[in-house]
Every structure is written in structure tokens, then in C-alpha cells.
């Protein structure tokens, strides 16, 4: 089932320097909660500056949903320590609040009024909040409070020069984009390995079902927790943040222009379902528009091709201008065993897997096959640790035992690990392979199995409160290592100033501005 990568690996072993200079970044979302685990109803802390313009600390869907962002970094330890400093500083500024350590929230009642993230009075800020109003009205606010970790990854130019002979200009843009699309297609085919190893949301609180019937064979604990005994990541299931209305958009990952055309089509395609919500009611705007996607960011995807946008530029226009610059991996649950929601083992594994995905052959993929890849993901998400579980290839009928496929994949990853270790010295990447491959013979070692044991004993709420309290105490005590208090204060003040400048520069009323942007 695993493609034959032996030639590509032999090439890599002859050109190890092609991997020198991998760049990464991390984003981590987390809810601010009170000591009893309920959602904080306070505004974004003043000490953290403006959520609209702060470089490292912002908000996602809700006012209480923090998002931490590291700068692009070539050094794993430095990036993780930077992320830890953001957590350390924030933990000291949250008063009695703490950061929820799980992907799935718990103490949020059905229909509870969840304050949307606020970004000030500028047209840009109001647009961001209106987009969130649309998400709330389309999918429900509860779904939007699920948190995850995003891992951004790019290969050095030396890789593309050695692999594809690229120089500069239009041809380089096309070749590099084609290489990243190959990575993405392999990710759709084999990325289920991420929830298998690192999924950490095997259970949900009953409020998540919102009284709706479900066909999933949930088991229920006395405290009202629902779980699937072999599930890995319910966050990635249809109970979590997915969008069924997007499944027939026909967006594919074979070619840059084809992908962008699909994305642009989706933001212009009217939706009957969302038209029923209405765009405005009693003078209040309910969504940006009633199309399948309000804006491009609404496209639900476990991985995204990206390029840093210029002012006023859409993500797809940035891709057309310069091609794919980096990849955003979006399938990581919060790691409940780390105070910062992610750890070094995961980052090193993702490095290995991304390199494998870009090396392995990846035939072009129709939108039908893309839908078929979802079958493997769903199996792993809902019953990944089940003995005897099998996986298929695309829409074909042949089945393969998951542990065998996993071990075959790791045989290749071990060779990538040897190459990366040869550049950096040490055996860190190989060690990660040895630790993780054991999860295929013993699923009890996976994150989902480990956290489920705690959840069955303590409930989701009890587990979240205990871990959150321990991490709060730890982070508040630890000294800052990379950033200093003065730098946080300077960025707080600068971010507030930047927001004020944006607000002062606005010249037209929001309604007129929106008419041009909706």
C-alpha cells in the first residue's frame, strides 16, 4: 500500500544537504477558562495588546479563544522555547483564569452565548468579527471552540534546486508548487497516521451532541461523557469542525491554477442552505454573504498550501502571484501531555513525514478519489486503535492491516531520519522513529489511548481542570528564556498603536466598505 520510495530515498542519501534549512512555524489555540473549567467571559487581556495586530498572540473564533503564533524558525528547540515563552507570559497575565489543555471544550452549555472575538472599530476588524458571526450562524458556536495546533513547513530552496533543477522565475514557481501539491496528495492518502499517533480527542461532553441523534456507537460514563473505545480524534470527525456542504466543491490538488479556480468558484457559489439564514435581519448583519464560503479561509481542509499575503491580497491571489511558499498542517489535536500543546517528538515526526510526502510518487487525484481518501481518515478517527482495522487505497477494494502499513511507512521514515540526523548530528530523528513505530504493535501507547484512560477515570472536565491547573502553576513559575518582559510590553504597545492607526486611516462607512469586499 505504501508507494515504493527507494529510488527517491537513495537520491536523498546522496544529497543530504538538500534538507539543510527546513523552516517551520507553530500556531496553538487554547480557550481561556475559569478555575471551574467554564469559559471565561472576560475580554481579551489588556496585557496581551491588540488581537488584531499583535505579532505573536491573537484570538481565533471567540474572544476567549487565544491563539499563539511563533515566527518562522529553522531551529526546533528555539521555536518550541519561543512558544513556551508566549505561554509563560500569558499564564502570568490571566489572573485566576487558565488555558484549557484539551482540543475539545467541556463546560459550555448548549446555546450558551459565546462572545465572538472583537477586533476594534476599523472596517477590517469589524469584517473579521462578522465572518465569525457567519461561522456561528452556519455551524454553531460550540463547534468553533474546538482547538488545535497548526504546523507550518517549508523546504529550503536548495532542495528544489537539487530535486527539480529550479533556478528563479515563473518555471521555478510552477515546479515548486507542483512539488508541494505532490506532498499534499500524499498527505490526503497517508496523513491518517497523524491522528493515529497524536489524536487526543477520543471523547466529547454530552453538550456537543446538542440533542441531535447520532449513528455513532458511543459509550457513556456516569458523568455524561460520550466516548468511542477505539477513537483517536473526534475533533476531526463530522462531530468536530467539518463542513459537509464543501465536499462537492470539486477542489483538487493537482495544479496551482486548477486549485485556485476551485477556491474562487467556491466563494462565488450561492448556497441555498446559507441563504435561508439570511444576510441581514432587523438591521443586523448575520454573515458576509450566503455563498458556500464567505471567504477563502472558510474552506475546511486538513492541510493547506500557503503564501504570505500582501496587504489587501486574498490567499488565492498570493498563490497565483508567487506559487506555494509553505504548507500548513491542520490535523494536530492539542497535545494534552505538553504545557504548550505540542512537543519536540511531534515536530520531528512531522518533518520526517513531510519530507516523505514530497519524495513519494503521488499520482494525480480526482475529486472523487479525494473523497475516497476520507474513508481511511474516518476509520482511524473513529476506531483507529481497533484490533484488525484495515485501510484501503483510494476508491479500490483491496484492504491492508493498519499496523503493517504503519510499520512499512516507518521503515522509509527511518531512512529520512538517518539523513536528517547526518546533517544535524546526533540521533534525534531516528529516536523519534523508534519511539513512535512501537505504537503500531501497541496502540495503548498512542495519545488517544493514554488520555482516554484519564478521561474514563476523571471525565473530560476533571482531566482538563487537573492538567490545566498543573500547567498554569508550572508556566507561571518558569523564567522567560528567549523573550523578555520588556519585549512583551513593547509589542503590546506597538500592537495597540497599529490598531489605532488602522482605525484612523478608515475613510468610508463599514456598509460601503463591505459592499466592495463581500
From Swiss-Prot:
Q: In which pathway does it act?
A: Sulfur metabolism; glutathione biosynthesis; glutathione from L-cysteine and L-glutamate: step 1/2
> Which keywords does UniProt give here?
ATP-binding, Glutathione biosynthesis, Ligase, Nucleotide-binding
Q: Which GO terms describe its cellular component?
A: cytosol
Read off the lineage from the record.
Bacteria, Pseudomonadati, Pseudomonadota, Gammaproteobacteria, Enterobacterales
Can you name this protein? Glutamate--cysteine ligase
Query: SUPFAM superfamilies, from UniProt?
Result: Glutamine synthetase/guanido kinase
Supply the InterPro entries for this chain: Gln_synth/guanido_kin_cat_dom, Glu_cys_ligase, Glut_cys_ligase
Record field: catalytic activity: L-cysteine + L-glutamate + ATP = gamma-L-glutamyl-L-cysteine + ADP + phosphate + H(+)
**What GO annotations for molecular function exist for this entry?**
ATP binding; glutamate-cysteine ligase activity; metal ion binding
Biological process per Gene Ontology, one example term: glutathione biosynthetic process
Membrane-crossing segments per the record: none
Say which domain of life the source belongs to: Bacteria
Q: What is its EC number?
A: 6.3.2.2
What the entry lists under Pfam families is as follows: Glu_cys_ligase
Q: Which gene encodes it?
A: gshA
UniProt family annotation? Belongs to the glutamate--cysteine ligase type 1 family. Type 1 subfamily.
- What is the top EC class of this enzyme, as a single word? ligase
Range of residues in the leader sequence: none
Amino acid at each position: 500500500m505504501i508507494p515504493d520510495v527507494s529510488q527517491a530515498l537513495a537520491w536523498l542519501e546522496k544529497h543530504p544537504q538538500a534538507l539543510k534549512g527546513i523552516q517551520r512555524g507553530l500556531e496553538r489555540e487554547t480557550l481561556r477558562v475559569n478555575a471551574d473549567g467554564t469559559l471565561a467571559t472576560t475580554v481579551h487581556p489588556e496585557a496581551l495588546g491588540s488581537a488584531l495586530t499583535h505579532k505573536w498572540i491573537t484570538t481565533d473564533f471567540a474572544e476567549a479563544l487565544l491563539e499563539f503564533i511563533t515566527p518562522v524558525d529553522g531551529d526546533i528547540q528555539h521555536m518550541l522555547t519561543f512558544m513556551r515563552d508566549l505561554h509563560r507570559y500569558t499564564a502570568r497575565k490571566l489572573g485566576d483564569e487558565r488555558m484549557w489543555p484539551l482540543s475539545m471544550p467541556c463546560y459550555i452549555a448548549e446555546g450558551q452565548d459565546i462572545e465572538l472575538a472583537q477586533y476594534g472599530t476599523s472596517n477590517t476588524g469589524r469584517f473579521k468579527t462578522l465572518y465569525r458571526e457567519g461561522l456561528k450562524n452556519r455551524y454553531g458556536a460550540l463547534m468553533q471552540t474546538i482547538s488545535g495546533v497548526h504546523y507550518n513547513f517549508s523546504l529550503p530552496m536548495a532542495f528544489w534546486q537539487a530535486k527539480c533543477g529550479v533556478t528563479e522565475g515563473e518555471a521555478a514557481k510552477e515546479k515548486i508548487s507542483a512539488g508541494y501539491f505532490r506532498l499534499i496528495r500524499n498527505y490526503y492518502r497517508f496523513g491518517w497516521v497523524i491522528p493515529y499517533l497524536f489524536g487526543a480527542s477520543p471523547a466529547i461532553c454530552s453538550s456537543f451532541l446538542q440533542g441531535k441523534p447520532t449513528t455513532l456507537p458511543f459509550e457513556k460514563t456516569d458523568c455524561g461523557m460520550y466516548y468511542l473505545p477505539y477513537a483517536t480524534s473526534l475533533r476531526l470527525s463530522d462531530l468536530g469542525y467539518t463542513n459537509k456542504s464543501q465536499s462537492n466543491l470539486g477542489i483538487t490538488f493537482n495544479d496551482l491554477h486548477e486549485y485556485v479556480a476551485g477556491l474562487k468558484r467556491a466563494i462565488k457559489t450561492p448556497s441555498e442552505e446559507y441563504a435561508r439564514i439570511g444576510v441581514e435581519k432587523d438591521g443586523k448583519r448575520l454573515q458576509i454573504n450566503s455563498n458556500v464560503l464567505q471567504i477563502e479561509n472558510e474552506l475546511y481542509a486538513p492541510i493547506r498550501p500557503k503564501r504570505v499575503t500582501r496587504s489587501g491580497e486574498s490567499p488565492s491571489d498570493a498563490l497565483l502571484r508567487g506559487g506555494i511558499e509553505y504548507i500548513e498542517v491542520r490535523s494536530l489535536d492539542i497535545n494534552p501531555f505538553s504545557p504548550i500543546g505540542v512537543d519536540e517528538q511531534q515536530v520531528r515526526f512531522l518533518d520526517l513525514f513531510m519530507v516523505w510526502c514530497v519524495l513519494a510518487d503521488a499520482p494525480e487525484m480526482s475529486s472523487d478519489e479525494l473523497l475516497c481518501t476520507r474513508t481511511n481518515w474516518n476509520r482511524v478517527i473513529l476506531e483507529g486503535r481497533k484490533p484488525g482495522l484495515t485501510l484501503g487505497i483510494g476508491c479500490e477494494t483491496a484492504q491492508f492491516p493498519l499496523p503493517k502499513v504503519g510499520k512499512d511507512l516507518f521503515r522509509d521514515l527511518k531512512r529520512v531520519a538517518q539523513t536528517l540526523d547526518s546533517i544535524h548530528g546526533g540521533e534525534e530523528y531516528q529516536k523519534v522513529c523508534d519511539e513512535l513505530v512501537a505504537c503500531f504493535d501497541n496502540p495503548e501507547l498512542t495519545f488517544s489511548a493514554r488520555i482516554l484512560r484519564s478521561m474514563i477515570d476523571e471525565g473530560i472536565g476533571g482531566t482538563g481542570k487537573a492538567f490545566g491547573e498543573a500547567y498554569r502553576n508550572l508556566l507561571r513559575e518558569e523564567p522567560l528564556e528567549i523573550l523578555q518582559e520588556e519585549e512583551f510590553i513593547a509589542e503590546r504597545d506597538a500592537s495597540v498603536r497599529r490598531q489605532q492607526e488602522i482605525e484612523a486611516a478608515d475613510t468610508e462607512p463599514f456598509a460601503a466598505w463591505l459592499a466592495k469586499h463581500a
